[in-house]
Amino acid sequence: MTSGSSSQQSVGLAAKVGAGVLALWGVLHVWVGVEGARQFATNGTRALWTMFLGGANAPVSAYQHPTDAVTSTVQGHLALNFCLDVGAAGLLGLALAWMIWKQASWSAYFIALVVIGVIDNAFLFTQVTPGLIALDAGTIGGPVLWAVACIVTPFGLPSIRAQRPVGASSVPA
């Protein structure tokens, strides 16, 4: 039996559920990247900012868009970069979900736990909780999906203690 098939057999239901939830997180974040790029390409900087704003402390109606071209261009490209980074994080989430589902990868789990955790919690605590971006199902959905995936996944992964390095013999010397 190859190591790929043995690790595939060792992926439990909880890990598959966690991987599915992480994949959903990835799709949500890829959508943000695509929608941000679409808004910027079709309607410019104002539309892109309108996509973000709307929190209790930053209502769309109160936000003053820059009037000079340089500031507007800089802000637009920074916001576009943010959207593309979010989309790239979504692709990372999809890749990690696949690795968990197919390979029972503890490495993928820990990358999701730490890297995606930093990404989502930075967004939550620097944008949503201060009231800059609206607190709604879309903005809280990502952190909730991440938390569910992190809580559920380990229960379906093989014991981390039972894993041996590739090429290690199971017969004692």
Language model feature labels by segment:
Residues 2-173:
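Topology signature of small-to-medium multi-pass alpha-helical membrane proteins
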